[in-house]
């Protein structure tokens, strides 16, 4: 029974400015620290996206998630590394993982 | 909020190293990779920084358009690309840079909050945030609101005279000699050096800087109202985008001219350029692709727009900003939270991004294509037809083409589809004209519009535009909402054309002149 914690920043994050577009869909909150409910299988990014969609997205989910993955043009960083190096949707989350979503789309 | 990140840092490194699926940096082959630039090209953090910084300097070095000591205006929007650009210039100027950049930068931010209905307070907040970021750069900066387009002079729509420059190498040599001389006299004041070079950084321009900053604080309400009206009169989001782009370029040009900048750096990434390549083709601006997407855009003559970020993809920029803590400011724009099919620009972006997700070489392919495009022969002989430029975008007009062209075909079809309307209105039109000459109007106000000078002017106004700008103007409900400088310049031009026609008989042809 493991409790998972991760910080959930949205946007181009810097020490001073913590904004970058995608947060508009999340009620203006840039950073989320969430505890995922326990489940028998380990959590992966695919399940995390479904969870985000149901629990965090306040409006227009299609602007963030399309199909079972993120909208093309939104980058995903897992612990400050490209998710393409980490297995993308199949990456298994660990305790205290830090996932960042950066929108490269014009207008955020 | 950031503290957490710092607390996690040591652990983060452990996890990344353990889980990079065995991928190491392709360059140093030691550290574990953090970023995949292209399929198979994985970079570690330090190699990525080196690569990124090198690319910026290589782009500038390869093109040799910025002369040493020249004043360069950095167009800053708050977004990731222009933030990265400003940071790169800062990096290049820093003392420990191996080959220091030798131009003199200034930064311009244009507040466009009105266009997307932001309140005064929100705009103030954005501006103070931008100010905080810009103050840290140490460069002089201007914060200007888009409302200032209503006080622009008509001369902004005239092409400037390109400055005659000696060979790049000679200029560099001259600069070096001057710097050496300066070093001997012990005078390290860069301002004086510039004054010697004839670049205008006088106190008066400093004062004008202050003027811009102070006026931007409180744009007059009448101007704000006018701007809202103008954007409300555009029927489509596509037209709004084009309109904003046009006004913004005029304002940038104006600030550059009044403050003595001869180059403007614009931070478009290659992702953005491939999107605008596709959308510009769809918008009927295909003839100007080399100007709109190329490295150096010299349509204004005296001020060149250069795009030093065009070798970077947005992914690289986003990673760079994130990994090296480059501050950017997020400001909602016209296309924030809009539907995918709301405008042509938006649609092209979605198209490119979708393709890119499945075929990772999409952007680079489109971008390489844009690189191969060259200025058409119209621009090659610009010396002869320098006057015939689009009123709005200042590109050489693409409407003087042969009979058997797509342009003429669309013109004819447009004419024919209007003919029915014209027939319907014909008696009103002809009688309207005759009654107007007599100084009275026989019809009601609805028909009366027909003999208003503005309505009569409309066709000639459209004639001064390129095909792409015609489409944008067609989407405007009325031309009256356009800023005064556009209307003035249009009037000015049509008067000149008339005058030219009047004295045409007395003018000597160039060929004739040669004969005599």
UniProtKB/Swiss-Prot annotation, chain B:
Function text: Plays a central role in 2-thiolation of mcm(5)S(2)U at tRNA wobble positions of tRNA(Lys), tRNA(Glu) and tRNA(Gln). May act by forming a heterodimer with ctu1/atpbd3 that ligates sulfur from thiocarboxylated urm1 onto the uridine of tRNAs at wobble position.
Organism, as annotated: Xenopus tropicalis (Western clawed frog)
UniProt lineage: Eukaryota, Metazoa, Chordata, Craniata, Vertebrata
Coiled coil stretches, renumbered: none
GO molecular function, one term: tRNA binding
Chief subcellular location: cytoplasm
Annotated pathway: tRNA modification; 5-methoxycarbonylmethyl-2-thiouridine-tRNA biosynthesis
Pfam families to which the protein is assigned, alphabetical: CTU2 (PF10288)
Compartments where located: Cytoplasm
UniProt record, GO biological process: protein urmylation; tRNA thio-modification; tRNA wobble uridine modification
Top-level taxonomic group: Eukaryota
SUPFAM superfamilies per the UniProt record, alphabetical: Adenine nucleotide alpha hydrolases-like
Protein name: Cytoplasmic tRNA 2-thiolation protein 2
InterPro entries noted in UniProt: CTU2, Rossmann-like_a/b/a_fold
Keywords of this entry: Cytoplasm, tRNA processing
GO CC field: cytosol
Cysteines paired by S-S bonds: none
Family: Belongs to the CTU2/NCS2 family.
